[in-house]
UniProtKB/Swiss-Prot annotation:
It holds the Pfam family ClpB_D2-small. Component of the ClpX-ClpP complex. Forms a hexameric ring that, in the presence of ATP, binds to fourteen ClpP subunits assembled into a disk-like structure with a central cavity, resembling the structure of eukaryotic proteasomes. One of its GO terms (molecular function) is protein dimerization activity. One of its GO terms (biological process) is proteolysis involved in protein catabolic process. This is ATP-dependent Clp protease ATP-binding subunit ClpX. Gene3D superfamilies: 1.10.8.60, ClpX chaperone, C4-type zinc finger domain, P-loop containing nucleotide triphosphate hydrolases. Residues 1-54 form the ClpX-type ZB domain. Zn(2+) binds at residues 13, 16, 35, 38. It comes from Streptococcus pneumoniae (strain CGSP14). InterPro entries: AAA+_ATPase, ATP-dep_Clp_protease_ClpX, ATPase_AAA_core, Clp_ATPase_C, Clp_protease_ATP-bd_su_ClpX, ClpX_bact, P-loop_NTPase, Znf_CppX_C4. The gene is clpX.
Length: 410
Protein backbone atom coordinates (compact mmCIF):
# COMPACT_ATOMS: atom_id res chain seq x y z
CA UNK A 1 0.00 0.00 0.00
CA UNK A 2 1.16 3.49 -0.85
CA UNK A 3 1.21 6.18 1.83
CA UNK A 4 2.60 9.55 2.79
CA UNK A 5 1.43 9.28 6.43
CA UNK A 6 1.77 6.55 9.08
CA UNK A 7 -0.31 7.24 12.19
CA UNK A 8 0.41 10.96 11.70
CA UNK A 9 4.12 10.26 12.37
CA UNK A 10 7.02 10.97 10.03
CA UNK A 11 7.84 7.96 7.84
CA UNK A 12 11.38 7.23 6.64
CA UNK A 13 12.68 4.99 3.85
CA UNK A 14 14.24 1.88 5.40
CA UNK A 15 16.94 1.85 2.69
CA UNK A 16 18.15 5.43 2.19
CA UNK A 17 16.76 7.04 5.35
CA UNK A 18 14.98 9.88 3.57
CA UNK A 19 11.73 11.12 5.04
CA UNK A 20 8.39 11.16 3.28
CA UNK A 21 8.81 14.91 2.79
CA UNK A 22 12.05 14.44 0.82
CA UNK A 23 10.66 12.00 -1.76
CA UNK A 24 7.62 11.76 -4.00
CA UNK A 25 6.20 8.55 -2.54
CA UNK A 26 6.93 5.94 0.11
CA UNK A 27 5.58 2.38 -0.10
CA UNK A 28 4.79 0.57 3.14
CA UNK A 29 5.72 -3.08 3.50
CA UNK A 30 5.95 -5.59 6.35
CA UNK A 31 7.81 -3.57 9.02
CA UNK A 32 9.69 -1.66 6.31
CA UNK A 33 9.29 1.27 3.92
CA UNK A 34 10.85 2.02 0.55
CA UNK A 35 10.80 5.30 -1.37
CA UNK A 36 10.30 5.75 -5.12
CA UNK A 37 13.97 6.73 -5.55
CA UNK A 38 15.19 3.43 -4.07
CA UNK A 39 12.70 1.50 -6.23
CA UNK A 40 14.12 3.19 -9.35
CA UNK A 41 17.69 2.50 -8.18
CA UNK A 42 16.86 -1.18 -7.59
CA UNK A 43 15.34 -1.44 -11.07
CA UNK A 44 18.47 0.11 -12.59
CA UNK A 45 20.72 -2.35 -10.72
CA UNK A 46 18.64 -5.29 -11.95
CA UNK A 47 18.76 -3.98 -15.53
CA UNK A 48 22.55 -3.61 -15.37
CA UNK A 49 22.94 -7.14 -14.00
CA UNK A 50 20.74 -8.52 -16.79
CA UNK A 51 22.88 -6.73 -19.39
CA UNK A 52 26.05 -8.13 -17.77
CA UNK A 53 24.57 -11.64 -17.92
CA UNK A 54 23.76 -11.22 -21.61
CA UNK A 55 27.23 -9.85 -22.35
CA UNK A 56 28.83 -12.71 -20.41
CA UNK A 57 26.85 -15.20 -22.52
CA UNK A 58 28.27 -13.67 -25.72
CA UNK A 59 31.80 -12.93 -24.52
CA UNK A 60 33.03 -16.37 -25.63
CA UNK A 61 31.67 -16.56 -29.16
CA UNK A 62 32.71 -19.76 -30.96
CA UNK A 63 35.40 -19.21 -33.60
CA UNK A 64 34.38 -19.58 -37.27
CA UNK A 65 35.90 -23.07 -37.46
CA UNK A 66 33.96 -24.09 -34.34
CA UNK A 67 30.73 -22.66 -35.77
CA UNK A 68 31.34 -24.54 -39.02
CA UNK A 69 31.88 -27.74 -37.05
CA UNK A 70 28.52 -27.22 -35.30
CA UNK A 71 26.76 -26.54 -38.60
CA UNK A 72 28.30 -29.67 -40.14
CA UNK A 73 26.59 -31.78 -37.47
CA UNK A 74 23.18 -30.64 -38.65
CA UNK A 75 23.47 -29.30 -42.21
CA UNK A 76 24.63 -31.35 -45.20
CA UNK A 77 26.41 -29.64 -48.10
CA UNK A 78 26.38 -25.87 -48.71
CA UNK A 79 30.02 -25.63 -47.57
CA UNK A 80 30.71 -22.16 -49.00
CA UNK A 81 27.52 -20.75 -47.51
CA UNK A 82 28.29 -22.27 -44.11
CA UNK A 83 31.77 -20.74 -44.13
CA UNK A 84 30.39 -17.31 -45.06
CA UNK A 85 27.76 -17.52 -42.31
CA UNK A 86 30.27 -18.69 -39.69
CA UNK A 87 32.59 -15.76 -40.41
CA UNK A 88 29.75 -13.21 -40.52
CA UNK A 89 28.19 -14.38 -37.25
CA UNK A 90 31.56 -14.49 -35.47
CA UNK A 91 32.41 -10.96 -36.65
CA UNK A 92 28.96 -9.68 -35.67
CA UNK A 93 29.23 -10.76 -32.04
CA UNK A 94 32.90 -9.79 -31.89
CA UNK A 95 31.77 -6.31 -33.00
CA UNK A 96 29.22 -6.18 -30.15
CA UNK A 97 31.89 -7.13 -27.61
CA UNK A 98 34.23 -4.51 -29.11
CA UNK A 99 31.66 -1.73 -28.74
CA UNK A 100 30.80 -2.80 -25.19
CA UNK A 101 34.43 -2.76 -24.03
CA UNK A 102 36.16 -0.11 -26.16
CA UNK A 103 37.49 3.13 -24.75
CA UNK A 104 35.66 6.38 -25.54
CA UNK A 105 38.81 7.72 -27.22
CA UNK A 106 38.88 4.98 -29.87
CA UNK A 107 37.89 6.29 -33.29
CA UNK A 108 37.09 2.99 -35.01
CA UNK A 109 33.38 2.27 -35.33
CA UNK A 110 32.69 -1.25 -36.56
CA UNK A 111 29.66 -1.37 -38.84
CA UNK A 112 27.07 -4.14 -38.66
CA UNK A 113 27.26 -6.82 -41.35
CA UNK A 114 23.84 -8.34 -41.95
CA UNK A 115 23.52 -11.35 -44.25
CA UNK A 116 21.66 -12.06 -47.49
CA UNK A 117 21.10 -15.76 -48.22
CA UNK A 118 20.10 -16.70 -51.75
CA UNK A 119 19.09 -20.23 -52.65
CA UNK A 120 16.26 -22.36 -54.02
CA UNK A 121 13.33 -23.58 -51.94
CA UNK A 122 14.35 -26.39 -49.59
CA UNK A 123 18.09 -25.68 -49.81
CA UNK A 124 18.37 -25.04 -46.06
CA UNK A 125 18.26 -21.25 -45.63
CA UNK A 126 15.90 -21.20 -42.64
CA UNK A 127 17.49 -24.25 -41.03
CA UNK A 128 20.97 -22.69 -41.24
CA UNK A 129 19.76 -19.53 -39.48
CA UNK A 130 17.94 -21.57 -36.81
CA UNK A 131 20.98 -23.75 -36.17
CA UNK A 132 23.27 -20.72 -35.79
CA UNK A 133 20.94 -19.08 -33.26
CA UNK A 134 20.59 -22.31 -31.30
CA UNK A 135 24.35 -22.88 -31.20
CA UNK A 136 24.87 -19.35 -29.83
CA UNK A 137 21.94 -19.59 -27.39
CA UNK A 138 20.46 -16.30 -28.58
CA UNK A 139 16.78 -15.46 -29.23
CA UNK A 140 15.64 -16.21 -32.77
CA UNK A 141 12.62 -15.11 -34.78
CA UNK A 142 11.39 -15.82 -38.31
CA UNK A 143 9.35 -13.37 -40.36
CA UNK A 144 7.74 -13.71 -43.78
CA UNK A 145 8.40 -10.61 -45.87
CA UNK A 146 5.24 -11.20 -47.92
CA UNK A 147 3.07 -10.70 -44.82
CA UNK A 148 4.50 -7.24 -44.19
CA UNK A 149 3.13 -3.91 -45.41
CA UNK A 150 4.35 -0.37 -44.96
CA UNK A 151 2.75 1.81 -42.29
CA UNK A 152 -0.79 2.93 -43.05
CA UNK A 153 -1.85 -0.15 -45.01
CA UNK A 154 -3.73 -3.27 -43.96
CA UNK A 155 -1.23 -5.94 -42.98
CA UNK A 156 1.59 -6.50 -40.52
CA UNK A 157 3.95 -3.69 -39.50
CA UNK A 158 7.68 -4.44 -39.66
CA UNK A 159 7.90 -3.69 -35.92
CA UNK A 160 5.94 -6.89 -35.30
CA UNK A 161 9.07 -8.77 -36.36
CA UNK A 162 10.73 -7.35 -33.25
CA UNK A 163 7.76 -8.47 -31.14
CA UNK A 164 8.42 -12.07 -32.23
CA UNK A 165 12.04 -11.68 -31.11
CA UNK A 166 10.93 -10.23 -27.77
CA UNK A 167 8.60 -13.19 -27.28
CA UNK A 168 11.47 -15.59 -28.05
CA UNK A 169 13.53 -13.76 -25.40
CA UNK A 170 10.68 -13.93 -22.83
CA UNK A 171 10.48 -10.13 -23.12
CA UNK A 172 14.04 -9.72 -21.85
CA UNK A 173 14.85 -6.63 -23.92
CA UNK A 174 18.63 -6.90 -23.42
CA UNK A 175 18.67 -10.48 -24.74
CA UNK A 176 16.37 -9.61 -27.64
CA UNK A 177 18.67 -6.75 -28.65
CA UNK A 178 21.42 -9.32 -29.28
CA UNK A 179 19.27 -11.87 -31.06
CA UNK A 180 18.94 -13.04 -34.66
CA UNK A 181 16.02 -12.36 -37.00
CA UNK A 182 15.53 -14.29 -40.23
CA UNK A 183 13.37 -12.52 -42.84
CA UNK A 184 12.27 -15.05 -45.46
CA UNK A 185 10.88 -14.52 -48.99
CA UNK A 186 12.58 -11.14 -49.43
CA UNK A 187 12.61 -11.77 -53.19
CA UNK A 188 8.79 -11.77 -53.21
CA UNK A 189 8.75 -8.06 -52.32
CA UNK A 190 11.17 -7.07 -55.07
CA UNK A 191 10.19 -4.09 -57.20
CA UNK A 192 8.53 -5.07 -60.44
CA UNK A 193 10.80 -2.74 -62.37
CA UNK A 194 14.11 -0.96 -61.90
CA UNK A 195 12.36 2.28 -62.84
CA UNK A 196 11.13 4.57 -60.08
CA UNK A 197 7.37 4.19 -59.65
CA UNK A 198 5.08 7.10 -58.85
CA UNK A 199 2.36 4.75 -57.56
CA UNK A 200 2.23 3.25 -54.07
CA UNK A 201 3.79 -0.19 -53.83
CA UNK A 202 2.20 -1.56 -50.66
CA UNK A 203 4.09 -4.85 -50.47
CA UNK A 204 7.18 -4.06 -52.54
CA UNK A 205 9.49 -1.08 -52.31
CA UNK A 206 7.55 0.42 -49.39
CA UNK A 207 8.19 -2.66 -47.26
CA UNK A 208 11.84 -2.69 -48.29
CA UNK A 209 12.14 0.91 -47.08
CA UNK A 210 10.44 0.01 -43.79
CA UNK A 211 12.75 -3.00 -43.31
CA UNK A 212 15.75 -0.82 -44.10
CA UNK A 213 15.17 1.28 -40.99
CA UNK A 214 15.22 -1.59 -38.50
CA UNK A 215 17.97 -3.51 -40.30
CA UNK A 216 20.43 -0.60 -40.33
CA UNK A 217 19.83 0.11 -36.63
CA UNK A 218 17.18 2.21 -34.93
CA UNK A 219 15.22 2.46 -31.71
CA UNK A 220 11.85 1.02 -32.67
CA UNK A 221 8.57 1.28 -30.77
CA UNK A 222 7.09 -2.21 -30.52
CA UNK A 223 3.44 -2.80 -29.54
CA UNK A 224 3.54 -5.48 -26.80
CA UNK A 225 0.26 -7.04 -27.94
CA UNK A 226 1.11 -6.95 -31.64
CA UNK A 227 -1.08 -5.50 -34.35
CA UNK A 228 -1.27 -1.84 -35.26
CA UNK A 229 0.02 0.91 -33.00
CA UNK A 230 -2.50 2.91 -30.99
CA UNK A 231 -1.86 6.23 -29.25
CA UNK A 232 -3.04 4.83 -25.90
CA UNK A 233 -0.87 1.71 -26.14
CA UNK A 234 2.35 1.63 -24.14
CA UNK A 235 5.26 0.73 -26.42
CA UNK A 236 8.42 -1.28 -25.78
CA UNK A 237 11.57 0.46 -27.03
CA UNK A 238 13.95 -1.92 -28.83
CA UNK A 239 17.35 -0.86 -30.18
CA UNK A 240 18.10 -2.89 -33.32
CA UNK A 241 21.73 -1.85 -33.79
CA UNK A 242 23.05 -5.16 -32.40
CA UNK A 243 20.37 -7.48 -33.79
CA UNK A 244 21.74 -9.67 -36.59
CA UNK A 245 19.39 -9.75 -39.57
CA UNK A 246 19.63 -12.67 -41.98
CA UNK A 247 17.51 -12.06 -45.06
CA UNK A 248 16.72 -14.90 -47.45
CA UNK A 249 14.95 -15.71 -50.67
CA UNK A 250 14.91 -18.08 -53.63
CA UNK A 251 15.35 -15.31 -56.22
CA UNK A 252 13.96 -17.49 -58.99
CA UNK A 253 15.32 -16.32 -62.33
CA UNK A 254 18.32 -14.41 -61.01
CA UNK A 255 20.60 -16.87 -62.84
CA UNK A 256 19.39 -15.36 -66.12
CA UNK A 257 20.43 -11.91 -64.89
CA UNK A 258 23.89 -13.28 -64.01
CA UNK A 259 24.19 -15.04 -67.38
CA UNK A 260 23.29 -11.84 -69.19
CA UNK A 261 25.87 -9.84 -67.24
CA UNK A 262 28.66 -12.39 -67.75
CA UNK A 263 27.77 -12.75 -71.42
CA UNK A 264 27.95 -9.00 -71.99
CA UNK A 265 31.36 -8.90 -70.33
CA UNK A 266 32.69 -11.65 -72.57
CA UNK A 267 31.50 -9.84 -75.69
CA UNK A 268 32.72 -6.46 -74.54
CA UNK A 269 36.14 -7.29 -73.19
CA UNK A 270 37.33 -10.33 -75.09
CA UNK A 271 38.52 -13.78 -74.24
CA UNK A 272 40.45 -12.90 -71.10
CA UNK A 273 37.21 -12.47 -69.19
CA UNK A 274 35.17 -15.27 -67.72
CA UNK A 275 32.99 -17.01 -70.30
CA UNK A 276 29.65 -18.53 -69.50
CA UNK A 277 29.79 -22.23 -68.77
CA UNK A 278 26.26 -23.60 -69.03
CA UNK A 279 27.12 -26.37 -66.56
CA UNK A 280 28.52 -24.07 -63.87
CA UNK A 281 26.62 -22.64 -60.93
CA UNK A 282 25.68 -19.04 -61.48
CA UNK A 283 24.51 -18.71 -57.88
CA UNK A 284 28.12 -18.29 -56.75
CA UNK A 285 28.63 -15.47 -59.27
CA UNK A 286 25.88 -13.19 -57.91
CA UNK A 287 26.92 -9.62 -57.13
CA UNK A 288 25.03 -6.60 -55.77
CA UNK A 289 24.29 -5.37 -59.29
CA UNK A 290 22.32 -8.56 -60.05
CA UNK A 291 20.26 -8.29 -56.87
CA UNK A 292 19.42 -4.67 -57.63
CA UNK A 293 18.37 -5.61 -61.14
CA UNK A 294 16.11 -8.28 -59.64
CA UNK A 295 14.26 -5.56 -57.73
CA UNK A 296 15.88 -5.08 -54.32
CA UNK A 297 16.55 -1.40 -53.59
CA UNK A 298 20.27 -0.44 -53.42
CA UNK A 299 19.92 1.01 -49.90
CA UNK A 300 18.78 -2.38 -48.57
CA UNK A 301 21.50 -4.23 -50.49
CA UNK A 302 24.03 -1.90 -48.88
CA UNK A 303 22.88 -3.03 -45.42
CA UNK A 304 23.31 -6.70 -46.41
CA UNK A 305 27.02 -6.81 -47.30
CA UNK A 306 27.49 -10.55 -46.69
CA UNK A 307 26.19 -12.80 -49.49
CA UNK A 308 25.73 -16.52 -48.88
CA UNK A 309 24.61 -18.41 -51.98
CA UNK A 310 23.13 -21.87 -51.50
CA UNK A 311 23.15 -24.50 -54.23
CA UNK A 312 20.25 -26.65 -55.40
CA UNK A 313 20.51 -29.88 -53.41
CA UNK A 314 21.24 -33.02 -55.44
CA UNK A 315 19.76 -36.49 -54.93
CA UNK A 316 22.96 -37.55 -53.15
CA UNK A 317 22.73 -34.50 -50.85
CA UNK A 318 19.14 -35.35 -49.95
CA UNK A 319 20.03 -39.00 -49.22
CA UNK A 320 22.78 -37.79 -46.88
CA UNK A 321 20.33 -35.37 -45.23
CA UNK A 322 17.97 -38.29 -44.59
CA UNK A 323 20.50 -40.34 -42.65
CA UNK A 324 23.65 -38.42 -41.61
CA UNK A 325 22.89 -35.32 -39.48
CA UNK A 326 22.57 -35.56 -35.72
CA UNK A 327 18.80 -35.09 -36.03
CA UNK A 328 18.39 -36.92 -39.35
CA UNK A 329 14.84 -37.86 -40.33
CA UNK A 330 15.64 -41.58 -40.47
CA UNK A 331 16.96 -41.41 -36.89
CA UNK A 332 13.85 -39.51 -35.78
CA UNK A 333 11.45 -42.12 -37.17
CA UNK A 334 13.58 -44.95 -35.80
CA UNK A 335 13.33 -43.34 -32.37
CA UNK A 336 9.55 -42.98 -32.71
CA UNK A 337 9.07 -46.69 -33.50
CA UNK A 338 11.55 -47.75 -30.83
CA UNK A 339 9.02 -46.60 -28.22
CA UNK A 340 6.81 -49.42 -29.53
CA UNK A 341 9.78 -51.85 -29.37
CA UNK A 342 9.95 -51.92 -33.17
CA UNK A 343 13.06 -51.51 -35.31
CA UNK A 344 12.89 -49.46 -38.51
CA UNK A 345 15.11 -49.95 -41.55
CA UNK A 346 15.25 -48.05 -44.85
CA UNK A 347 16.72 -49.75 -47.92
CA UNK A 348 19.26 -47.63 -49.80
CA UNK A 349 16.96 -47.74 -52.85
CA UNK A 350 14.12 -46.42 -50.68
CA UNK A 351 16.19 -43.43 -49.59
CA UNK A 352 17.08 -42.78 -53.24
CA UNK A 353 13.40 -42.87 -54.18
CA UNK A 354 12.47 -40.44 -51.37
CA UNK A 355 15.17 -38.05 -52.60
CA UNK A 356 14.02 -38.39 -56.21
CA UNK A 357 10.45 -37.56 -55.20
CA UNK A 358 11.61 -34.43 -53.39
CA UNK A 359 13.53 -33.34 -56.51
CA UNK A 360 10.49 -33.97 -58.72
CA UNK A 361 8.25 -31.94 -56.42
CA UNK A 362 10.87 -29.16 -56.25
CA UNK A 363 10.54 -29.07 -52.47
CA UNK A 364 14.16 -29.82 -51.59
CA UNK A 365 14.98 -30.92 -48.05
CA UNK A 366 11.79 -29.49 -46.57
CA UNK A 367 9.70 -31.99 -48.57
CA UNK A 368 11.45 -35.10 -47.25
CA UNK A 369 9.39 -35.42 -44.09
CA UNK A 370 6.05 -35.31 -45.91
CA UNK A 371 7.19 -38.09 -48.27
CA UNK A 372 8.18 -40.29 -45.33
CA UNK A 373 4.87 -39.52 -43.62
CA UNK A 374 2.97 -40.60 -46.74
CA UNK A 375 4.99 -43.82 -46.93
CA UNK A 376 4.68 -44.72 -43.25
CA UNK A 377 1.15 -43.55 -42.45
CA UNK A 378 -0.37 -47.05 -42.35
CA UNK A 379 2.65 -48.44 -40.49
CA UNK A 380 2.47 -45.80 -37.76
CA UNK A 381 -1.30 -46.32 -37.48
CA UNK A 382 -1.30 -50.13 -37.27
CA UNK A 383 2.03 -51.24 -35.77
CA UNK A 384 1.53 -49.83 -32.22
CA UNK A 385 -1.41 -52.26 -31.87
CA UNK A 386 0.49 -55.26 -33.29
CA UNK A 387 2.67 -56.50 -30.45
CA UNK A 388 4.23 -59.28 -32.53
CA UNK A 389 5.79 -56.88 -35.09
CA UNK A 390 9.48 -56.34 -34.33
CA UNK A 391 10.87 -54.89 -37.59
CA UNK A 392 9.56 -52.56 -40.30
CA UNK A 393 11.53 -52.34 -43.55
CA UNK A 394 10.87 -49.52 -46.02
CA UNK A 395 11.61 -50.52 -49.62
CA UNK A 396 11.69 -48.57 -52.87
CA UNK A 397 8.31 -50.08 -53.76
CA UNK A 398 6.84 -48.84 -50.48
CA UNK A 399 7.96 -45.31 -51.33
CA UNK A 400 6.70 -45.31 -54.92
CA UNK A 401 3.38 -46.81 -53.81
CA UNK A 402 3.55 -50.11 -55.69
CA UNK A 403 3.83 -52.19 -52.50
CA UNK A 404 3.55 -51.92 -48.73
CA UNK A 405 6.39 -51.74 -46.16
CA UNK A 406 7.64 -55.15 -45.07
CA UNK A 407 6.69 -56.16 -41.51
CA UNK A 408 8.67 -58.87 -39.71
CA UNK A 409 7.21 -60.56 -36.65
CA UNK A 410 8.88 -62.19 -33.66
Amino acid sequence: MSTNRKNDMMVYCSFCGKSQEEVQKIIAGNNAFICNECVELAQEIIREELVEEVLADLSEVPKPIELLHILNHYVIGQDRAKRALAVAVYNHYKRINFHDTREESEDVDLQKSNILMIGPTGSGKTFLAQTLAKSLNVPFAIADATALTEAGYVGEDVENILLKLLQAADFNIERAERGIIYVDEIDKIAKKSENVSITRDVSGEGVQQALLKIIEGTVASVPPQGGRKHPQQEMIQVDTKNILFIVGGAFDGIEEIVKQRLGEKVIGFGQNNKAIDENSSYMQEIIAEDIQKFGIIPELIGRLPVFAALEQLTVDDLVRILKEPRNALVKQYQTLLSYDDVELEFDDEALQEIANKAIERKTGARGLRSIIEETMLDVMFEVPSQENVKLVRITKEAVDGTDKPILETA
